[in-house]
Amino acid sequence: MTSQAMKIQTALAIALLTAASLVLAGCSGVDSTTTVTTPVTVSGMVLNGTVHGGQQPINGATMQLYAAGSTGYGSAYTYTSGTSLLGTHVVKTDINGGFNITGDYTCPTPTTEVYLVATGGYPGPTAPVNNNIALMAALGPCGLLSGSTNVNINEITTVASVWALSPFMTGIANIGTSSTNAQGLTNAFATVNELVNIGTGSVSGPALPVGATLSAATVAKINTLADLLAACINSSGGVAGDGSGCGLLFTAAKVSGVAPTDTITAALNMAQHPSANTSVATTVSGGAPFQPALTSAPSDFSLVITYTGGGISAPKGIATDSTGNVWVANSGGSSVTKLDALGVTTTDTTGYLSGTNGYNVGSLNAPVALAIDLSGNAWVANGNSTVTEIAANGLTGTLFNGGSMSSPSSVAIDASSNVWIANSGNGSITEITPGTTPAYNNYNGFGVAAPSAIAINPK
């Protein structure tokens, strides 16, 4: 990580940009179902689009519109008639890969996150049916879909959607979050539009903020992953180990010895195990449809978005608040930067410093760590053995310098809003009880020596 940029792996970024923490691993979530028999009446709009394998239209692919669940990670939203919002309606692509969904669905709620999936079909005018085909595009809140919504589903939209949603995903029809982390799922769907333009099926997305970039290496990874999917999709299919395009992909995407049988599941396995079998990248030919591609095997298939601006300078600490905003402690600029869930530097209604050089209130001094309390205030450990509390809006700051703090290295906040600081300089722990007259306690002994981190046991 350079002193002027913050790089966040997409899979990790989704966790960091959520109201929850790093436990958002789709492979370890609860696979359950949210069943609704009487959906909220939000009329479905016409959806138009095309499905392509590489540059080749897919004819006869079956379209499904799915909604994300809310009863656990990897949960599915289900009507009594099935998991798809289209119910018994059958929508297939035509010879040009085109599809038209003419309002044959009802949004569960206006804010329910939805996504389109295309499976099967003929990947060319004379090609046989390929049942290994599975492509997708994350659309976002159901209520925002309109008659002008046009979707170009291909391998690029599939890679972007799967990688962004992988912490919440266990299968094609299983994307969901817990009842306490709806914001996290919202942020993940929004991240898709930073990676890809769903309307054109190309990198990068319209939501990529000013100052944020996809590196050449990340673009090459996306293209390579898309090419691996295309080698399977633009074929008659196959199984792991048969040497075909599908066979190579499914072999590389095995998890615990079990090979996938469709391209979305293969992509999901690779997203959730990004360091496994990366040598498959070398099987992509120079004539593959998505270029530029990788020329050698990467160390992993993680996707990185680089965020700059807002005063980011030698960042040392990062934390998220309850609405998904990311707070960054800038040791190089003695400031704190606040980014929204898409990485956009925030500017308060008063035009405060966050959009330029970051917040610098409360005598910030080479901050090294920070934590957010239940009210959204940021508590920042400074390099000069003090702690600064920054109000949630960034407009005011309060300096705390008691409790024998010495080179604080980490901050944590308990359920009673007490602030705990690990002091690496004198081998102690400081507790601050905020208030009009703050109270300080210092604890040493118990084998504490130069502590570098601190956490609270919620029990």
Where do the language-model regions lie?
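Beta-strand-dominated extracellular/periplasmic modules and repeats
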Residues: 31-144
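Hydrophobic helical h-region of N-terminal Sec-dependent signal peptides
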Residues: 13-21
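Predominantly extracellular/luminal cell-surface or secreted proteins
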Residues: 64-70, 119, 232-235, 339, ...
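Bacterial N-terminal signal peptides that target proteins for export
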Residues: 2-14
